[in-house]
Amino acid sequence: MASMAAAIAASRSAVMSGNRPLDDRERKRFTYFSSLSPMARKIMQDKEKIREKYGPEWARLPPAQQDEIIDRCLVGPRAPAAAADAGDVRDPARFPGLRGPTGQKLVRFGDEDITWQDEHSAPFSWETRSQMEFSISSLSIQEPSAATVTSDARSLAKAPQGTQGSKPAQSSRSSSLDALGPARKEEEAPFWKINAERSREGPEAEFQSLTPSQIKSMEKGEKVLPACYRQEPTTKDREAKPVPQEQQTLPSVSAEQEVPQPVQAPASLLPKATPTESPEKPPPPAVQRDEDDDALFSEPALAQISSSNVLLKTGFDFLDNW
């Protein structure tokens, strides 16, 4: 309201001081634009000063000349000169865009001769041009000509039979590799089934503790006895194992017996015995053989005792290393 009152007061003062009174339309225009903002009020006051400066001649001037006088008085002569000296200001460097025509359709506007090219009418595809132009046929091996076929046939005829026999073997190997895929899946199916049964806990679990060898036997369809029904190796089996080792030790003993004994010199040539201590005699071969047998019998028993305390491995490294 304060700005409106100030605009009305300014318009009244301008009318009172002017050479000619403002009509009703000019007064409303001045009041409206002066009430918009302080900058607009300042512009309207400057225009009134210019009009007062020219006096009664202002009304006789054409509107274009009035606008030119207002621009020259408000802006000043320096601003157009500075703009002219700047020359052609080029567009700043920005990201390059596609400047060519992208559309394939001409749009006509009604009956008038107005046409423009629709930039959104190009064919759309999720693939790029290089992907659409790519084809496997360009990478395929071209078929050899008849001359090359005949030369290959001649070279094969000259080649030895060994090389000809190796080619069917390679083809059979490739066919076996191709057939390995479904067979591998059929082998893995019972394995995962058994593994799922092992993961079940409680009395419902059928396979509470299985070793990798038992899993393999179950995959083959064989029945596996629980750990409680498995028999421990008897003492006869333990005695049967070191027999080959004992046979290996016997030739060494016989070789020692075959070594020729040194010929004893006559007693007259031997020096007199001194009271020094006699060297220790090696034990007879029979006693040494018994000790070796005891050591051989004791080693498997210790190995079995130590293996019973070790937890069985599952065969999966990522589970055993936890």
Curated annotation (Swiss-Prot):
Keyword annotations of the record: Acetylation, Cytoplasm, Phosphoprotein
Phosphoserine (modified residue): where?
Answer: 37, 130, 176
User: Where is there biased composition of kind Basic and acidic residues?
Assistant: 183-203
Q: What is its main location?
A: cytoplasm
Mark the residues carrying the PTM N-acetylalanine: 2
Which InterPro entries does UniProt cross-reference here? DUF4706
Q: What is the recorded name of this protein?
A: Uncharacterized protein C1orf198 homolog
Task: Print the organism lineage.
Answer: Eukaryota, Metazoa, Chordata, Craniata, Vertebrata
